[in-house]
């Protein structure tokens, strides 16, 4: 941003942002940007601008629009029994010019960033001298391509994509894993399996969760900090 000579100006408030807040563009405005709330969710008296509303405003004002999707996904996750997350395709179909999202996390690939959208804007981004320093290397691209091919039909994503395989693991398998871990503790420890809701995290589905299990670990002579330290000092840290 410093190199480009631009300034990021926030609009609206923490819990309420209206289209009228975005509408206060000036001759110096260069882009309209909306950002995924990442790992938090605001409840109660809230208001936000939809992607389609922002896209329409961008068309009216002659400004490009960008939506940072955070984690990002390219499939409807509700098909796998997971909470809904807006897909990259849906945002682009709403008229947004550019989107950014992660290549790892929900997509299930290698750590990298993806920029997609209008070709002329992508071509302009490619001209930035910083691109050579920040672009993905060949190994990253090869791994990302192999992951994206898993999405080609016919596919069996919940079995072939590790992230989906983990998120959709049946409760029976989780119970089996919990039992194996419980049996691995020395007899002095008291280990109980409890039902919980796991947060996906990594900028995805804030406030949502999926049914999961946790282990509650206690010891008559060790407090929580000592147990935690011992777990972290194992050959395979926990």
Q: Which sequence ranges carry the predicted segments?
A:
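Short N-terminal helix-initiation segments at or just after the protein's N-terminus
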Residues: 38-39, 85, 153-163, 189-193
């Amino acid at each position: 941003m410093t190199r480009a000579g631009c300034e990021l100006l926030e609009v609206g408030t923490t819990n309420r942002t209206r289209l009228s807040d975005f509408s206060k563009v000036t001759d110096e405005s260069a882009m309209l940007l909306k950002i995924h709330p990442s790992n938090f969710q605001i409840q109660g008296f809230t208001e936000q601008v939809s992607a389609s509303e922002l896209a329409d405003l961008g068309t009216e004002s002659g400004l490009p629009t960008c939506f940072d999707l955070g984690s990002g996904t390219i499939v409807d996750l509700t098909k796998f029994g997971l909470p809904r997350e807006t897909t990259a395709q849906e945002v682009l179909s709403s008229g947004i010019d550019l989107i950014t999202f992660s290549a790892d996390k929900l997509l299930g690939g290698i750590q990298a960033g993806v920029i997609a959208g209008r070709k002329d804007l992508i071509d302009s981004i490619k001209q930035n001298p910083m691109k050579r320093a920040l672009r993905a290397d060949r190994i990253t691209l090869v791994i990302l391509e192999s992951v994206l091919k898993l999405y080609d039909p016919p596919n069996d994503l919940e079995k072939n994509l590790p992230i989906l395989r983990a998120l959709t693991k049946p409760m029976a398998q989780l119970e089996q894993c919990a039992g194996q871990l419980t049996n691995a503790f020395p007899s002095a420890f008291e280990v109980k399996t409890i039902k919980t809701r796991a947060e996906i995290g990594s900028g995805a589905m804030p406030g949502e969760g999926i049914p999961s299990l946790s282990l509650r670990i206690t010891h008559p002579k060790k407090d929580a900090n000592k147990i935690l330290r011992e777990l972290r000092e194992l050959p395979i840290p926990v």
